[in-house]
Amino acid sequence: LEYSKEKKHGSDDLLGQENRLDWLTPLCLLGLSILSILFIQSAQAYTGGDQWKMQLIWCVLGFGAYLLFSWIDYHLWMRYAHFLYIIAILALLLVFGGPVLYGASRWIDFGIFKIQPSEIAKWTTMIMGASILARSKVGGMQDSLSGIAKVGLCFSLPMFLIFLQPDLGSTLVFPPIAFSLLYVARIPTRFFIATFVVFVVLIGVLGWDVFRYYQYKSENPRTSEATIAYEETSLVPLKDYQRKRILTFIAPEVEDPHGIGANWNRIQALIAVATGGITGKGLGNGMQAKLGYLPTAVAHNDFIFAVLAEESGLWGSLLAMLAYGLIIFGCLKVAAKSSDRFGAMIAVGVSVLLMTHLFVNVGMTIGITPITGLPLPFLSYGGSFLVTCFMMLGVVQSVYRYRKEFR
C-alpha cells in the first residue's frame, strides 16, 4: 500500500467537507440491519421468539457506537492499546467462572444480558498488534523478526484462552488478521513463504489426526469412554465434536451416513438455499426454519444466511453480498488513503476480519467449509459481535475522516 504524504494544513471543518465522510458504508449497514431484523423474526415466527426485538436494540446501539467512534480520532486507540488489550485478556479469563452454555464457557453474565469477550478481543488484539507494528522499525531482518515476535505473542495469548473455552472458530479468525497487519507493515516476503510451509505441515497433521480418529471410531464402540480414551492419546488438542465437524465435512457418508446426526444442520441449510430458487419463497414463507428442520437454536444466528437465501432467493443473497462487498471495498479504500501505517493496518485488519467471517459462515451454509460457530456480520443474532463490528467500522470511518491530521 502507498500511504499519502499529506500533512496537516490548519484545522479543517469536518462538518463542511463531504469528502471526509463515507456515506456508502452506513447505508449498507442500515440495509443489512433491516434484513437482519426481518429474517430473525421470520426464522422464529413459528416458535414465537422475540429475539428480533433485542436485535433491533443492538442495531440502534451499534449505530450509536459507529457514530461515536467515527468522531474520535483513531490515533487515540494507539495510545490506549495496551490498556484495552489487558482488559480484553482479563475478560477472557473471567468467562471460565461464568455460565456454561452448549458445552462452552464463552460468556460473562450480567443478568439482563451477556457479553462474549472473544468478539471484543478480536478488536482489541488487532489494535494492539497494529500499535506494535506502527511503533516498530520493520524492513531489516532483525527489526522484522522483533516485530513478528511481538505480534505473535500479542495474538497467541487471546487465541489460547479462546481455544480453551472451547471456540475453535473464533480462534482461527486471529491468524488472518495478524498476517494482514504484517503484510501492511511490509514484513519481508520470505516470512510469509515460511509461514505457508508451516501451515501446510499443520494441515497435514490435522488430516492425519482426523484419519486416525475415523479409524479409531470404526474399530471401537462409539461411547464417551472411547472418545475420552482417544483424546488422551491424540497429539492434536481438539474436542470430539470438532473432529466430528471436520470429518462430517470431508466424508459425511462416513460420520453421518443417514444425515440425522452431525450432518443434519448442513443438509437442512443446503435444502433451504436450494429451494429458495431465484426469487425466493417470500418473507415468512420459508419452510426449513418454520417447520423446525433447521433447528431454532441456530436458524437465527449461525444459519441466518440459509433463511435469507430460502425466502429471498438468489437475488436477495446477491444483494446482501453486494452490501458486504461495498463495505469491505470501502475499508480497503480507506487503507489506501490513510496518512499513516497505523490507520492503514486498522482498515485492512477490519476488512480481513469481516471477509473471514463472511467466507466461513456463508461457506458452511452452502457446504464448502466445515460448520463452525462464526456469526455472519450484521445479520446473525447477537449483541457482542454486532456492536463490535459497528465500532470497528466506526474507527475505519475515523481513519478516513482524520486522514489529513497525520503529523
Task: Please give the residue ranges for each predicted region.
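Hydrophobic alpha-helical transmembrane segments of multi-pass inner membrane proteins, especially
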Residues: 26-42, 46-265, 306-366, 391, ...
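A juxtamembrane structural motif centered on a specific transmembrane helix
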Residues: 1-14, 40, 338, 356-407
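Long extracytoplasmic/lumenal interhelical loops at the membrane interface
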Residues: 260-261, 267-315, 342
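N-terminal low-complexity, intrinsically disordered patches enriched in charged
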Residues: 45, 71, 178, 285, ...
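Re-entrant/interfacial helical elements at transmembrane boundaries that shape
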Residues: 173-174, 285-292, 323, 365-373, ...
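N-terminal membrane topogenic signal
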Residues: 13-29
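Residues that form generic nucleotide/phosphate-binding pockets
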Residues: 17, 249, 272
